[in-house]
Amino acid sequence: AAAAPGAAGGAQLPLGNRERKAGCKNFFWKTFSSC
C-alpha cells in the first residue's frame, strides 16, 4: 500500500488521480488552464 503513490497518494493528496478530474474545476482552474 505504501508503494502505491497512485492509489494511496491519489486519494489523500488534493492533486491525486481522482481529484485531478473531480476537483479540476475547483482548484485546478486557478493553476491549470488546460484541464
Curated annotation (Swiss-Prot):
Keywords: Cleavage on pair of basic residues, Disulfide bond, Hormone, Secreted. GO terms for molecular function: hormone activity. Belongs to the somatostatin family. Disulfide bonds join C24-C35. The lineage of its organism: Eukaryota, Metazoa, Chordata, Craniata, Vertebrata. This is Somatostatin. Its main location: secreted. Somatostatin inhibits the release of somatotropin. It is found in: Secreted. One of its GO terms (cellular component) is extracellular region. The gene is sst. InterPro entries: Somatostatin/Cortistatin_C.
